[in-house]
Amino acid sequence: MEDLKKVVAYKAVDEYVQSNTTIGLGTGSTVFYVLERIETLMKSGKIKNLVCVPTSIDTEMKAKSLGIPLTGLTKNLKIDIAIDGADEVDSDLNLIKGRGGALVREKLVAANTACFIVIVDESKMCEDGLGTTGAVPIEILSFGYEMIIESLLKISALKNCTYKLREKDGEIFITDNHNYIVDFFFETPIENLVKTCEQIKMTTGVVDHGIFANMASIALISKSNGTILTLNKNK
């Protein structure tokens, strides 16, 4: 599986990353291969004057260790493209993200780029709908978190879900934004995806959620037969 991640990450960089651009960098194991490829092309001189926007402390530290120039998400910044992985992708390029814990910053960068490119291996494709292969994360405030969860359980799509406050090393997991994450688990694909997104986001105390609906521009899917499938939102 690591080979599939590497191949698709390298493909994304080779095909879409150009000199004199600003790149949004996602979070996770596949994105580390993106960083690796960017470093190689910068050292060879094939890419110049590149600056990147990291979506997590992990990505920031890795990029710094490779000498990749970074900037923050500032008011007048133009992000030419963003490259990130995903936990699930459907045929309409809707996504589940955030199982790595960086969903808010990932979504903020994705929402402010001209082109959001998703890179995954074929195991992440969910043709029958999203939400059934693992957690659907929702980042919430730590203050009053139990009350926030109770409010979320009133949403129609979440009523029959099981849920768990995310932990790490026996402690409550804290995001880079100093919030909690509650993971919801669906037995069947999420119905009324866009409406559910809106209802979750409108819940007081919710920072954001891991459903990325109508955000991806392009998906590159690395397949075990050695090919890479490109899906374009506009086609």
At which residue positions do the language-model features occur?
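N-terminal active-site beta-alpha-beta segment that forms phosphate/nucleotide-binding
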Residues: 1-84
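Conserved phosphate- and dinucleotide-binding cores of soluble alpha/beta proteins
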Residues: 3-7, 57-235
